[in-house]
Design a protein with these regions (language model features):
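Mature extracytoplasmic or organellar-lumen-exposed domains after removal of signal/transit peptides
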Residues: 26-383
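C-terminal motif of bacterial Sec signal peptides marking the signal peptidase cleavage site
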Residues: 15-18
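Bacterial signal peptide processing site
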Residues: 20-23
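Detector for intrinsically disordered, low-structure N-terminal pre-sequences
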Residues: 8, 25-26
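Sec-dependent signal peptide recognition
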Residues: 2-10
Length: 383
């Protein structure tokens, strides 16, 4: 009997040791994204991005007024920094603003937001008072190509509304999506992971904080879309968003075919991963969004530089000023992209400022230099 007890103890010890030695079973979470960006809880939609829709609408109207010599600097400043003075009274009532979300992430240089404020001063002090004058090198005013485009520009040929709006492509949209709402620091901040795992909802809402942050990132691209059931942003090309979704549509049918679907699918997949608690999948999809958005910025920066060079060669100066003004804004935006190989922007703030200085005077910049800069951008992005 004594020997039996000893054998039993030895057997139990070996059994327990073997159990402890077995590796814990890893349960893989399978994430199945929905066909459309539709997510519900208890019959209620959990998707909300009204603040982003408001800011996109603000940007569209502000862009119009920056090219219409009727507003004062104070009025334009109020629209940008205070969120007031818009034709739609609901925008002011929303409490949302563009200025406080412009170049506001931790990677943004503190010098960028003042550049936008300076553009408001420039257009109201130099351009608007001189629209009755014929523009020329060093002289602000209006320039019209024979039988073609008309632009109102400063003495360097800058069409201010284009610099401003194209600059918001990066300083607002990419900065908010890439460096804030889809960043792990934002998504996983505080108790967000534990709350999402437990299904703890924001007070009075149908969504968790993590779900909402992801949706807000989504909203900076799709906030004015009239049909979220497709990858195409229906409001992005006419009468809707004037920011990144408009140019996503453009490159989707030309130089970056299929990019709209890739971004839309990644947003859907990442949001489904949040619902499932599969944060590794979420992060993989976030990186797809960040890389593809960055490619849009890089592609258009190069495109407008080349277009500007071609228009100068053709003697179409109004077209050249317009294209280079758009290019200026997209170059400014390069510092808000993300290179997946380095985890940093494709271009630093210092590099961007150097590039802007090189093309500063649109009347005198050499087409060869514009094409060289475009080629350099294409090379860095791997186009």
């Amino acid at each position: 009997m004594k020997n039996f007890k000893q054998l039993l103890v030895m057997f139990l010890g070996i059994f327990l040791f073997a159990c402890e030695d077995d590796p814990a079973e890893v349960v893989e979470i399978v994430v199945t994204p929905p066909a459309t960006y539709t997510f519900e809880r208890d019959g209620q939609s959990t998707v909300s991005f009204s603040g982003q829709s408001a800011r996109l609408e603000m940007a569209a109207e502000l862009g119009t007024w920056l090219n219409t010599p009727m507003k004062t600097a104070a009025e334009l400043d109020a629209m940008f920094n205070d969120g007031t003075g818009f034709g739609n009274p609901a925008l002011a009532a929303s409490g949302k603003k563009l200025g406080n979300k412009t170049a506001s992430s931790s990677i943004a240089s503190s010098t960028v937001k003042p550049q936008f404020d300076a553009l408001i001063v420039d257009v109201t002090s130099n351009v608007f008072p001189n629209v009755a004058n014929d523009a020329s090198a060093g002289t602000p005013g209006t320039y019209t190509d024979p039988g073609g485009r008309t632009v109102i520009i400063n003495g360097k040929g800058h069409e201010i509304n284009q610099l401003f709006i194209k600059g918001l492509m990066g300083a607002l949209v990419c900065d908010q999506i890439i460096w804030q709402y889809l960043s792990t620091g934002k998504l996983d901040g505080g108790t967000n992971v534990a709350d999402n795992d437990a299904g703890t909802l924001v007070d009075g809402k149908s969504y968790t904080t993590m779900e909402h942050y992801w949706d807000e990132g989504f909203g900076y691209l799709y906030g004015l879309d009239t049909d979220l059931n497709t990858a195409e942003v229906e409001g992005g090309s006419s009468g809707g968003d004037v920011l990144v979704s408009k140019y996503m549509n453009k490159v989707n049918t030309s130089s970056l075919p299929g990019i709209s679907q890739e971004i839309y699918d990644a947003f859907k997949h990442g949001r489904a991963a949040i619902v499932a608690g599969a944060y590794d999948v979420r992060d993989e999809q976030a990186e797809i969004v960040k890389t593809k958005l960055s490619h849009i910025i890089g592609r258009k920066a190069a495109d407008y530089l080349k277009s500007g060079a071609d228009k100068i060669d053709d003697g179409k100066w109004a077209d050249a000023h317009h294209a280079l003004s758009e290019g200026w804004g997209f170059i400014l935006s390069l510092q808000f992209t993300k290179n997946p190989d380095t985890g940093s922007p494709y271009y630093s703030n210092a590099e961007v400022n150097s590039m802007l200085a090189d093309i500063d005077d649109f009347w005198t910049v050499a087409p060869a230099d514009l094409r060289s800069m475009a080629t350099s951008i294409e090379s860095k992005f791997g186009f």
